[in-house]
Amino acid sequence: MTQRIILHIDFDYFYAQCEEVRTPALKTKPVAVCMFSDRGGDSGAIATANYTAREFGVKSGLSIQSAKQKLKNRTDSAFLPADFEYYSEMSEKSMSIIKKFADVFEYVGRDEAYLDVSEKVEHDFVKASHIAQQIKNEVREKTNLTCSVGISPNKLLSKIASGYKKPDGLTIVTPDKISEFMETLNLEDIHGVGKKTVQKLAEEGIETISQAKNLDIFVLISMFGRKTGTYIHNAVRGIDDEAVKIRASMLQLSKIMTLKEDSVDYTFLEKTCLNYVKNCIPLLLMRIKCLDQLGYISHKLIFLVKQNLRC
């Protein structure tokens, strides 16, 4: 079988980095991009933070109040409201540069993409590394953004590799180095292996990649079911046959609502969410109609309700 070569591009602390590009003076300061809620004040959560802020424990998902507490001694800290229109513009500019290097380009999100470059580089990892560096250089030159790149024979390994030497990293995992590379990882480093899975394995005395590799596939299937068990069996060996699929960027419309007060009353929450969705539908349909007239094609209408209960 001809060797595939897959690149995973991952922009470093993307939202915060975009803000640094817009305002270069922020580069030496702790920067946190915030999702402010409807409650006003410091209610809301951190979307992302630059590495200076991360040194103080500020990370995605942390409440804004907690983040400000961690940075209380840094009077130069910047807490900025998320500007998704600007981030999308920066993403589109970057992705237009990146996709021209691919045989097959798969858009994952504003800050992430897969490229199959197998044919373009004639299945040569050295040539692939040159393309990766070319991508990094051109993106930096035209957008002032840095990105990290992982190169390997499959999507799973490339995604792990892109996060290996952040920020502004480039990591190559050739077929003969897969086993060695996997031994440097923790189980939770594998995409798709979450905390609950790691905990369940730990309960059986399985805490390392090596130990997981020694488990019979049928044991894993009995623990997690056929799909997940098979995935874990393959993933700890660096095996992934999923193809890079042509997927362009999508325009997503979203609206976030935060309750005025925290609640664990499911009847109240259900009623509130249903009323909110009913009120959103006419506006959303109107916006979709306008976008259709501009040439966008509507594929799906999905309502996703996330709950964050704190007891």
Language-model regions: role of each:
Residues 1-110, 114:
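Residues that scaffold, gate, or flank divalent-cation-dependent active/transport sites
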Residues 127-185:
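Long, highly charged, low-complexity intrinsically disordered interaction regions
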